[in-house]
Amino acid sequence: WADSVLATLSVRPKAAQMVWVWTLGDYTAVDAPQYVTIEKQIADLELGGIIVSVGGPMDIATKVNALQRASKLPLMVGADLETGAAFRARGGWFLPNAIELGGATSFPYQMGIGATRDPKLAYEMGRVTAEEGRAMGIHMAFAPVLDVNNNPKNPVISARSFGEDAKLVGEMGTALVKGIQEHGMLATGKHFPGHGDTEQNSHLELSKVNVSRARLDS
């Protein structure tokens, strides 16, 4: 199906399929400026996907479904799900009776899972993440973190990593990827080789890997 559709597209919509737009996952009125802008971008530019941020599970699913309807082609939907679907799907309150609504399963940061030394638990984390994320219409998890946390001065990786041992990171990361991908969701290993040995916060500035090739390969 994908090949047959791709063959019908000109260069511009092909390029647009590589562009994703970010959106909050919270409830948004259909005439709210933020929502109208994103809906128009998707419909007019034929964008390929959306990156969903924080919102309640029902709100995320509702917004994803609405944007899917606005798109000429099915959208890919991704989200940062490093500690499970709860990394983006938060709970809330239903009025007037103030009944607490659940969000999604929240797991420890990966260092907590790595401390168990049990790949089966990492697999189960992936399974639950995929099942809950797919229920909200999310296709791709921007997880797991596969950086090796081997620099105590690193300000941004820390507990997001499985640990400082490359073998452990590989084993636990492989299990988590399998748990995600064997249950209908795509996984994304991140961030890049050596990022666990940098000293910059990559959310704020460009991280630099100031080590030799031999250290990278070790």
Regions inferred by a protein language model and the residue ranges of each:
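Alpha-helical scaffolding within the catalytic cores
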Residues: 1-6, 33-37, 218
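Proline-centered turn/helix-capping motifs that create local helix->coil transitions or kinks
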Residues: 180, 184-186, 196-197
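Enzymes and membrane/adaptor proteins characterized by extended Gly/Ser/Thr/Asp/Glu-rich
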Residues: 24-172, 191, 196-212
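Mature N-terminal segment immediately following signal peptide/propeptide cleavage
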Residues: 1-26
